[in-house]
Amino acid sequence: FVHIGGWCSYQGGNPDWAGLWHGTPIDEILPVHVSNTWDTNDDGVDIPRLNDARHPIAAGLDWRALQRFGGYNRVTAAEGAHVVLSDPKSRLPLIVTGTYGEGKTVAFTGGLAGGWDADMIKWKDFPQLWRNIAAFIAN
């Protein structure tokens, strides 16, 4: 599907939901390299680094108002991937885009269930971030 122009989006989550994508066909599609074990930063990032303010995912968002990006899955960007947001201390990616065949891929390494990212979910631009991600991978 992605190879012919579809999309793939990966979101981090609870350890019980661990994707364990390493070594699977999904691992090949993702714009990140994932570990073969559960590897997280549960401390999070106080102020994430916006690497590309002009990227369509970042467009129109008040990143200065995002004071905290909670815990995240430790991954590394795949060759040719584009890191939109990162942890300034570890330099690990938080939001990464890539391509696979004719399609687009996105990895959001944080959580969405409110545990890790309770503060991020309260960010006024959080809904728009996901609209931007959906629009990016759909185009």
State the predicted function of each range.
Residues 78-82, 89-92, 99-104, 110-139:
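Extracellular ligand-binding/catalytic regions of CAZymes and related secreted enzymes
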